[in-house]
Every structure is written in C-alpha cells, then in structure tokens.
Amino acid sequence: MTKITNDLFLKAARKEQVDRIPVWYMRQAGRSQPEYRKLKEKYSLFEITHQPEICAYVTKLPVDQYGVDAAILYKDIMTPLPGMGVDVEIKSGIGPVIHNPIRTFQDVEKLAIFKPEIEVPYVLDTIKLLADDMLDVPLIGFAGAPFTLASYMIEGGPSKNYHQTKSFMYREPEVWAILMEKLGRMTANYLIAQINAGASAVQLFDSWVGALSRADYAKYIRPVIEMIVSEVKAAHPTTPIIMQAVGASHLLAEWETMPLDVVGVDWRETITSAREKVPTKAIQGNLDPSTLLAPAKCLEEAERILQEGVLEPGYIFNLGHGVFPEVPPEMLKKLTNYIHERSEILLKKG
C-alpha cells in the first residue's frame, strides 16, 4: 500500500492539531474538469466506474490538479442499487431514474441481499488500485444513506418535496422499517468492504434527509443510521466516518450522540454554531458552491469561514454541497491554495 505522506485530513478528522487546514471538495472528481468531459464523450458514468483504471484516473485528477488533501472515490450513490435488483439509469440533465419504483411490500420484499465482493468488485478494485499504487493522500469511500436512497427508489427519480416517500413512511411504517433494514444492511456491508479494500475514511451522504423533521428523523431514520455506524465501527474502530446532509442543521444534535467522527454542514449553519451543537465531532464545510462562480465573493466567504474554522482543532474545509459543472477548474485550484496559505498564517498566529 502506498504510504500516506499527507495525513492532514485524517488528523483533522480525529480533532488533532494541524499546521494548515485540510481541503477537499464534494464532487471534486469529474464534472467541471476538461479531461473528464472528454471521457464522458465516450463513456457513461456507470461505464467509467466499471473500469478501475479509468475510474482511478478520474478520482486522482483533483489531487494532482487542485492539490486537495483527500481523494473521494468517483462513483454514484446509486452504484450498489442494481445489485439489489433496482433498475436505475442516470439520465443526463435529470439524474437517477428508477424504472421499477417501490410501491408495495412485495416490491420491498423482492430487494436482493447485497454482497459487495460479488455485485461491485470493480469499486473495490478501483480502491485497491488507488490505495496500493497511486495516492499519497487519504482516499474517502462513500455510500448514500437509506433515506436518500429510498427517496429515489420510491419517487422514481429526483423530487422537490419527497411527498411519496414521506407518505409511504407514514402510511406503511412496518414496510418502511423493512426497507430501512435492507438498505441499512447493504450500506454497512458496502462501507466495510470499501475500508477493507483500502479506503482511509468513509462518508454517508444523506442529501435529502433535511426534508424530515427532527421528530420524524428520530423515529424513522435514526435507528438505521445507528446500526450502520455501529457496524462500521465494530469492523474498523479507528476509521473516520463522516455524516453529510443538506439543509439538516436541525439534526445536528441527533448526530452528536452517534459514534460519528465528522459532521458536514452547509452554508445555512456557521462553523461556530455547528461546534456548539456537535462539540465532540470534527466539522466539515461549509462554503456555498454558488460562490465559486463569483471569485471575489468566494474568497471573502472562505476567509470568514476560515476565521471560525481555525479556532479549534477538528476542522476540514469543504463545500456545503457538490461542485457545479460550470465551475472553472482554476477556481478550485485558486481556492485550495488560498485555504492552505491563509490557514497556515492564521494557525501560526494562534
């Protein structure tokens, strides 16, 4: 395995002292990069992820080009679902489309048991390739969390309000619990397999869970998240686990009492306020990705965020959501350099 010579991200995830703030970006691999766009002229997303050499190349690009302190595996949260019998297609300009949406108990019952080594060996091979030969920074594996996956599976695709998902949850609580258990078991096994293959940390993306109230989260979602995190920690006690959601500041207190290591926040929450709500966790975030299209505002906001971030150990600079395709790659490089150079000065000042 290649030796990790830059462990800033891992130190920050453990709330240890660092000499500069680590940086990485959600959706840093692909999307805005010309090299990636050229590949997409020839291959679909799933075709890229099925070819370990190409997928590893895409994953490593932002490390080489932007100088980020961690790589995140290039794939989609939908990647494991075909292994459960879900007919999913990634449509350009739309996103994931499910051709056999969940509507009944029978639909849930038909979902197959997911075995990562059998269903997604190409994902594990990509991780091994990166960890063994290509990276000197930590590699982050990830999975979609059960609510977000269920929202696609029930709605049949992206949604603005998640009415069908929430009404299914309220109307069929027993069936919902079975669906959560199946997705939770898949997610735990998937994350453990990624760590076994060489991932240094894992992130749970619960992109749409902010649509739920805290009471509904505690009743319908928290049990499965606790199960996932507990199983991953039982298998890999020292591997950092990150929870990332959007518009979910009202759920921070729920995550404080789980064995998570890092909590990602978006631009609706300040770093200082987040620390008050999750004092035992490292914080990741929280630049609004829209500012990347307004360079002066971007650096102004980055400075404000940094001023809060450096006050205590356990801070990782990131966005509050993913990089847009329109973002110029040179802006990400400029921002990375700014965070590194400016944070080093601020940390020296103490």
UniProtKB/Swiss-Prot annotation:
SUPFAM superfamilies from the UniProt entry: UROD/MetE-like (SSF51726)
InterPro entries: UROD/MetE-like_sf, Uroporphyrinogen_deCO2ase_HemE, Uroporphyrinogen_deCOase
Keywords for this protein: Cytoplasm, Decarboxylase, Lyase, Porphyrin biosynthesis
Range of residues in the leader sequence: none
Pathway membership: Porphyrin-containing compound metabolism; protoporphyrin-IX biosynthesis; coproporphyrinogen-III from 5-aminolevulinate: step 4/4
Predominant localisation class: cytoplasm
E.C. number(s) listed in UniProt: 4.1.1.37
Catalytic reactions of this protein: uroporphyrinogen III + 4 H(+) = coproporphyrinogen III + 4 CO2
Site (Transition state stabilizer): 76
List of residues binding substrate: 27-31, 46, 76, 152, 207, 321
GO biological process, one term: protoporphyrinogen IX biosynthetic process
Recorded GO MF terms: uroporphyrinogen decarboxylase activity
Free-text function comment from the UniProt entry: Catalyzes the decarboxylation of four acetate groups of uroporphyrinogen-III to yield coproporphyrinogen-III.
Family of this protein: Belongs to the uroporphyrinogen decarboxylase family.
Record-given protein name: Uroporphyrinogen decarboxylase
